[in-house]
């Protein structure tokens, strides 16, 4: 058998459910909360989501239930966007719930994300197949994709395929853009009088899909534990050799939740938080000044080494660079024909010629390799209009600018230390890992709970599990209307409904804890070494939650 010993042992793990979800479906009673409103742009969203806007928050409690179904279910499931640890356990939870409801129920997985739905490319997920993927990482059971469902033709195809397969519901496992797809599909089906339900599941290691009810998206726990182990290893390496500065870029397209969590777990000398950069309107030069200041002070202490954490999406939060990217984007969108068939050097000439004088200065002040990568990030925007920020090696940009600054200082006799930088990018290493105990339990519960929402006839909801700082048996299950998370944003020159990314709250406990400690972490070697994710052993270690959740849910 082509399977590791670890996988064999890990598949023996039985995920834990909230007590309410262990009950017979007829004894799970639905409780309606107050009707909801969107974050902003409420009138525009009311017009767009005429049938699904303003739904109430849902919770479940023990009591008599009036289920919407009595016969076997046919459910379609989609894995959308980048992988996150635990996706297979969401599917396992869905499978076990529908089979418990009626053993003749069927679960279909659409291959390659939303495109599989549009092309009716699917497989039936059988018990033997599901069992081989329980508690494993990745999205490879059916694979994922980033196709955006956004045209009338797409909606019609999705509806046709759903009816062709006699689907009662579709569950979309994904991030903000994927759950935007879910909200739009739910509205379209409802508008056309079709009784096909759509439920979303909050997935993203970035942790930017959340609100007061969605406490965290799945995958964040596992991924940050993996990155923190690696960063802790680099901290130990820095202490061992005392000659390297490790610059670590961490995945996280927009929000800095991953960087902040890893900083709280490892105590690096420097960690940039993108949201603070934006709030304080820091320039690129000011960020370099701050980093050089720490490097200089540590050098005076005899410490010519350290660890720096940089969030992947930082480049979009530096006001001058963000404005530059938007202007480059606008130039490309309005003059796309001029760029066809050109190499990158020729493209650069057109961009430079059309940039405003100020932005031209900003652009040309950047190292040449960054100038080219910015162009590539614009050319490679995903179907949702997001820049490919991972193309921009921000950590290398910082290294080059710091090196240049230190060389100048050395010539003036202001710096006598040594600076040997090493760059790293941690992202893909954590996306498809075996899920932690937390993510294994959380994901299984999210999937199981999604079925309970379906059995109660709900659509346009996101599966929600709360009180995540407690034992899984004490978690609270329910649902949050997808429209509650939305606003209107400009994509490719048009205002469109989109789930708003939840950024780091600069008034929140995690950031304040970081601010309280960062100055002493900068100059002292107070590194923590979290070690690898633990799957076996005492509950204190294997069931540990993130520092972010500990602080945010502190009573």
From Swiss-Prot:
GO biological process, one term: fructose 6-phosphate metabolic process
Annotated site (Important for catalytic activity and substrate specificity): 177
InterPro entries associated with the record: ATP_PFK, PfpB_PPi_PFK, Phosphofructokinase_dom, PKF_sf
Positions that bind substrate: 146, 204-206, 243-244, 251-253, 312, 428-431
Reaction(s) the record says it catalyses: beta-D-fructose 6-phosphate + diphosphate = beta-D-fructose 1,6-bisphosphate + phosphate + H(+)
Activity regulation, free text: Non-allosteric.
Cellular component GO terms held in the UniProt record: cytosol
A GO MF term: 6-phosphofructokinase activity
Protein name in the entry: Pyrophosphate--fructose 6-phosphate 1-phosphotransferase
Organism: Borreliella burgdorferi (strain ATCC 35210 / DSM 4680 / CIP 102532 / B31)
